[in-house]
Amino acid sequence: MIRAIEYRRFGGPEVLEEVDRPEQAPDDGEVRIAVRAVGLNPIDFKIFEGDLQPVERVQRLIHPRRWLEGASARFPRGVARDFAGVIDAVGAGVTGLAVGDAVLGTLRSAPGQADTRGALTTALVAPAADVVKKPAPLSFTQAACLGVASQTACGAFRQLNLHEGD
């Protein structure tokens, strides 16, 4: 069993609860990570507080299979996306990553969407493509802060359309 923080309804920190979940084995192309640190971002709070429900409604309109989804299909949900830890299992077909590698990553989902998973857990399974080796000089805590923040910074640089010499 793993320990995780999740929520079953929208609200403030009072809706968060610690639960036991069954440990998952990684499927093809996935790795399981023993989580050492998690990065919390403003988007994480906005999601569990329910601030992004209008975005979720639009997402449901776009995907007809989700039109009849009730609350039970959307909950429970995990908290946080960014993590750092050590790989403890590797699925078939994974190359470049091995058991014992220190890594960092971000649990990816549609923009503004929550996920039933969550990085605020003792272990998680993620696609190997969403995980990179942690640079040795960084602590696990520092590495766990890179995901969403670095994506935001990269997006800003793309918007600025910077070129060499700018």
Residue spans for each PLM region:
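Cytochrome P450 core scaffold surrounding the K-helix E-X-X-R motif
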Residues: 43-48
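Short glycine/threonine/proline-enriched tight-turn/helix- or strand-capping micro-motif at secondary-structure
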Residues: 14-22, 81
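Short structural boundary motif marking the start of a folded domain
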Residues: 1-5
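Short polar catalytic/cofactor-binding loops
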Residues: 8-12, 38-40
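Glycine-rich beta-strand-centered segment in the early N-terminal region that forms part
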Residues: 24-39, 52-107
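NAD(P)H dinucleotide-binding glycine-rich loop of Rossmann-like/cofactor-binding domains
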Residues: 67-81, 102-166
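Residue-level signal for short segments within beta-strands and strand-turn junctions
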Residues: 6-9, 49, 87
